[in-house]
């Protein structure tokens, strides 16, 4: 499947999120406007790239993009709003943080946040649209770095290994050590644990 860009639109921002599934930390989003005169080779869905390749591409994106920005919604906001609404809010923040206002926004997935700019959702857009691929890489690198920092503060939880996702290791550590302030209270494994304490 080949994506057809909107006709006659110059500044297109791609938007993606990372971190809807984890039990801990923020959902992180990115918005990127690429420079058509400085193409970046190797852009793809961040999940299909090695960590080393993601880091290299993230630096290249930051150097070559016309504009890029990050957005986020914290664990508390996720608990208050729910993960879908918090993700939409984080995407909106990423677009609003861009130093250049895009003419059109392409969003990975099947929903678009409320924006003052025309937008379109593209299912599996992170593998089809270069701008969304770039956004997915920046968001993934940023969130992974946050998990590495959390791992330094709380090495016993092994965040560097599972990145906050509900793996068997994370669930075992959660049961053994209890949740941190950064854990999402509204997510079932954390909620169940809090109800038994």
UniProtKB/Swiss-Prot annotation:
Q: Which GO terms describe its biological process?
A: DNA replication, removal of RNA primer; mismatch repair
Task: Specify one Pfam family.
Answer: RNase_HII
Q: Which of UniProt's keywords are assigned here? A: Cytoplasm, Endonuclease, Hydrolase, Manganese, Metal-binding, Nuclease
Which compartment or compartments is the protein found in? Cytoplasm
Tell me its cofactors: Mn(2+); Mg(2+)
Q: What residues does the RNase H type-2 domain cover?
A: 10-197
- Record EC number: 3.1.26.4
Q: Superkingdom of this entry's organism?
A: Bacteria
Residues annotated for a divalent metal cation binding in this entry: 16-17, 108
| UniProt GO MF annotations | manganese ion binding; RNA binding; RNA-DNA hybrid ribonuclease activity
Reaction catalysis annotation:
Endonucleolytic cleavage to 5'-phosphomonoester
The UniProt entry, under HAMAP family, shows:
RNase_HII_B (MF_00052_B)
Q: What's this chain's function? A: Endonuclease that specifically degrades the RNA of RNA-DNA hybrids.
> Which NCBIfam families does this entry report, sorted A to Z?
PRK00015.1-1, PRK00015.1-3, PRK00015.1-4
Q: Which family does it belong to?
A: Belongs to the RNase HII family.
Put simply, this protein is called Ribonuclease HII
**What organism is the protein native to?**
Pasteurella multocida (strain Pm70)
């Amino acid at each position: 499947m080949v994506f057809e860009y909107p006709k006659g639109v110059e500044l297109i921002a791609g938007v993606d999120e990372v971190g809807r599934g984890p039990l801990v930390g923020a959902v992180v989003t990115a918005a990127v406007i690429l420079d058509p005169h400085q193409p970046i080779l190797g852009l793809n869905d961040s999940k299909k790239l090695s960590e080393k390749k993601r880091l290299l591409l993230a630096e290249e994106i930051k150097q070559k993009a016309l504009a890029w920005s990050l957005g986020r919604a914290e664990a508390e906001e996720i608990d208050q709003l729910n993960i879908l609404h918090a993700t939409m809010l984080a995407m909106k923040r990423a677009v609003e943080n861009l130093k250049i206002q895009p003419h059109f926004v392409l969003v990975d997935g099947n929903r678009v946040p409320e924006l003052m700019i025309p937008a379109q959702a593209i299912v599996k857009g992170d593998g089809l649209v270069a701008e969304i691929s770039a956004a997915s890489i920046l968001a993934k690198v940023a969130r992974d770095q946050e998990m590495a920092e959390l791992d330094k503060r709380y090495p016993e939880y092994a965040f560097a290994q599972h990145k906050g996702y509900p793996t068997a290791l994370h669930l075992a550590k959660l049961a053994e050590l209890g949740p941190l302030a950064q854990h999402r209270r509204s997510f079932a494994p954390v909620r169940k644990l809090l109800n038994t304490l």
